[in-house]
Curated annotation (Swiss-Prot):
The lineage of its organism: Bacteria, Pseudomonadati, Pseudomonadota, Betaproteobacteria, Burkholderiales. The gene is hemA. This is Glutamyl-tRNA reductase. It comes from Cupriavidus pinatubonensis (strain JMP 134 / LMG 1197). GO terms for biological process: protoporphyrinogen IX biosynthetic process from glutamate. Catalyzes the NADPH-dependent reduction of glutamyl-tRNA(Glu) to glutamate 1-semialdehyde (GSA). Disulfide bonds: none annotated.
Length: 434
């Protein structure tokens, strides 16, 4: 069975390309079905898709594709067709990781070593969601199940035994730092949050600590926005929840806008921001777009009075704290390397399972036949001692027939290899019976 991880992330591609191959949550299950069909049929092929603002990754286990170029080209072709993105645009930015490299990558991703925010924990939850979705889609099997269960265990071990999460600057904290560079005080600003998911909740928590003048939450489902607004109000803030449709009329009211929705198209266009800036009499407005695909049209960045930041822009602020954790990174890498070797040993042992089953089936067939023969001998009154002698002798002869026949008929290097191997097999068998 071949393991393969193919992906694109914040280190290999800009957000302008990552957003073109992102998978909305509702599209992942049908995409998994299409991918498995593309990989030469569903039977025996396992797959999972991880899609976040910083990465899109496909994990596969298949005995159909060969490792290396064939698996890469096959999966690249599917990804290109599925998202209608030319393969020539994707290929330079994709990484293809077979076997142990795929295992190591999964362990590093879950442990936060491959994240823009080194040591962040959100990716572990996102990976668990991806595995749960793949399980519900019926695309997980023995190999990926084992890979991901060990991945979660390794992530727990890394976080428990190292300080990989210490000194971490989250994306949410980075957004606040940028706001503090633009405005003299966040406490005098009006803040708009668009969306009500986990990332917006994290951002809202960090901004709330700065006691902004007003916080408004805009969401497609107003009830969810109201819930977040109520939580912030409990911290003594002036809050309000509005519908997403009200954005056009109210955008000019806000000094800071933080957006992170699951929309596949921008929800804030250039024209809307131009009108807002005009109504603000050209007072500056800071916009943080944490969504992939992006919520704010990129052309907005050209406006003089708008400071627009994407997830890639926030990465520079985040990396300021990464150097402080290099000792923890070395510890984490050592743990991961050890666990990769353990998993690869398990994977290699899986290749002999069919042979073991075949041996067990053949042995059981011999046992049943000789046992039935012994019962017939006892039924006709034969001496039990003689029956046992005949039973044990027949079992010995039949079990040894295959190896002795091979030793007598093989030639050359094959025979020499068998001569070296067989005595060790029987010594092991003898020890195991004691």
């Amino acid at each position: 069975m071949q393991l393969l991880a193919i992906g694109i992330n914040h280190t290999t591609a800009p957000v302008s390309l990552r957003e073109r191959v992102a998978f909305p949550l509702e599209q992942i299950k049908p995409a998994l079905g299409a991918l498995r069909t593309h990989l030469a049929g569903r039977n025996g092929t396992e797959a999972a898709i991880l899609s976040t603002c910083n990465r899109t990754e496909i994990y596969c286990a298949t005995d159909i594709l060969k490792p290396g170029a064939e698996g890469f080209e096959h999966t690249l072709r599917w990804l290109s067709q599925h998202h209608n993105v030319p393969a020539s645009d994707l290929a330079p930015h994709l990484y293809s990781l077979p076997q142990s490299e795929a295992v190591r990558h999964a362990f590093r991703v879950a442990s936060g070593l491959d994240s823009m925010v080194l040591g962040e924990t959100q990716i572990l939850g996102q990976l668990k969601d991806a595995v749960r979705t793949a399980g519900e889609a019926g695309s997980l099997g023995t190999y990926l199940n084992q890979l991901f269960q060990r991945t979660f265990a390794v992530a727990k071990e890394v976080r428990g035994q190292t300080e990989i999460g210490a000194h971490s600057v989250s994306m949410a904290a980075a957004a606040v730092r940028l706001a503090q560079r633009i405005f003299e005080s966040v406490s005098t600003q009006r803040v708009l949050f668009i969306g009500a998911g986990e990332m917006i909740e994290l951002c809202a928590t960090h901004f709330a600590a700065q006691k902004p003048r007003q916080v408004v939450v805009a969401n497609r489902t107003v009830e969810r926005g109201e819930k977040l607004a109520e939580q912030l109000a409990e911290q003594g803030l002036t809050t309000q929840a509005i519908r997403l449709q009200e954005l056009g009329e109210r955008l000019h009211e806000f000094d800071i806008v933080v957006s992170c929705t699951a929309s596949s198209l921008p929800i804030i266009g250039l024209g809307a921001v131009e009108r807002a800036v005009k109504r603000r009499k050209h007072r500056p407005i800071m916009m943080v777009d944490l969504a992939v695909p992006r919520d704010v049209e990129p052309e907005v960045a050209r406006l003089d009075d708008v400071f627009l930041y994407t997830v890639d822009d926030l990465g520079a602020v985040v990396r300021e704290g990464n150097a402080l954790r290099q000792a923890a990174v070395a510890q984490a890498e050592a743990i991961i390397e050890s666990r990769v070797q353990n998993f690869m040993h398990w994977l290699e042992t899986r290749s002999v399972v069919p042979v073991i089953r075949e041996l067990q089936t053949a042995g059981e067939s011999i046992r049943q036949a000789e046992l039935e023969r012994a019962r017939r001998m006892l039924a006709r009154g034969d001496d039990p001692e003689a029956v046992l002698e005949a039973l044990s002798g027949a079992l010995t002869r039949k079990f040894l027939h295959g190896p002795t026949h091979a030793l007598n008929h093989m030639q050359g290097e094959d025979r020499e290899a068998l001569v070296r191997l067989v005595p060790g097999l029987f010594r092991q068998s003898s020890h195991s019976e004691r």
